[in-house]
Curated annotation (Swiss-Prot):
This is CASP-like protein 1B1. Residues 71-100, 156-180 are extracellular. Belongs to the Casparian strip membrane proteins (CASP) family. It is found in: Cell membrane. The lineage of its organism: Eukaryota, Viridiplantae, Streptophyta, Embryophyta, Tracheophyta.
């Protein structure tokens, strides 16, 4: 017999431990752009882009306001002849005669002053609210666009006239006035394009990393 021989049966193996729920591991995902580091040269170039755009926009707006504000031309015409003596009258064209041109000068002057002020504030490293600056950039861009559009409509009327309303063109008599006004309009539209680029760059930098 086994008991008599001193042999003992091995104890049965212990029952398997109940399976516990697998521990959930939480992994934190970091944005893909947080690990990317741009080189210092690229960072400096990216930081320099808004400054260059703003400076160019201020220069374009200031040039447009100055050229339009100084735009004036006189034209002398014979209106009657008394005997052998002609009677002449001098006509003068200047920007203050047209409300659209006055608005154009004011809008461009405001845009130039605003951009210069923002550049000076950033140069002195004072704290400025970025959201406020972005909103003001959009307001100034809209102001520039409306001023340029209003002046362009009046410039087209002065160049081609309106046959139905019997408004004769005036650029055939005030050619220099119209040419300088056209140069001011071109500078203003350049300022609008630069402000648009500045707003797009600001939106891209705010949405990106």
């Amino acid at each position: 017999m086994d008991l008599e021989r001193g042999d003992k049966k091995p104890p049965p193996p212990p029952p398997p431990a109940p399976r516990t729920a697998a521990a959930t591991t939480t992994t934190t995902t970091t944005p893909a752009c947080s690990g990317k580091k741009r080189p210092p040269l690229r960072d400096s170039l990216v930081a320099l882009q808004p400054v260059l755009l703003r400076a160019a926009a201020a220069l374009a707006a200031a040039a447009a306001a100055a050229v339009m504000a100084l735009d004036a031309q006189s034209y002398t015409a014979v209106v009657a002849i008394v005997g052998t003596r002609p009677l002449t009258q001098t006509f003068t064209a200047k920007f203050s005669d047209t409300p659209a041109f006055v608005y154009f000068v004011i809008a461009n002057a405001i845009a130039a002053a605003y951009n210069l002020l923002v550049l000076l504030v950033r140069r002195r490293r004072r704290t400025t609210a970025g959201l406020v600056v972005r909103m003001l950039d959009m307001v100034v861009m809209a102001l520039l666009a409306t001023g340029a559009a209003a002046a362009a409509s009046m410039a087209e009327l002065g160049r081609n006239g309106n046959a139905r309303a019997r408004w004769n063109p005036v650029c055939d008599r005030f050619g220099s006035f119209c040419r300088r006004g056209g140069a001011a309009l071109a500078a203003s539209f350049v300022g609008v394009a630069l402000m648009l680029a500045l707003n797009l760059l600001s939106a891209a930098s705010g949405a990106g990393c």
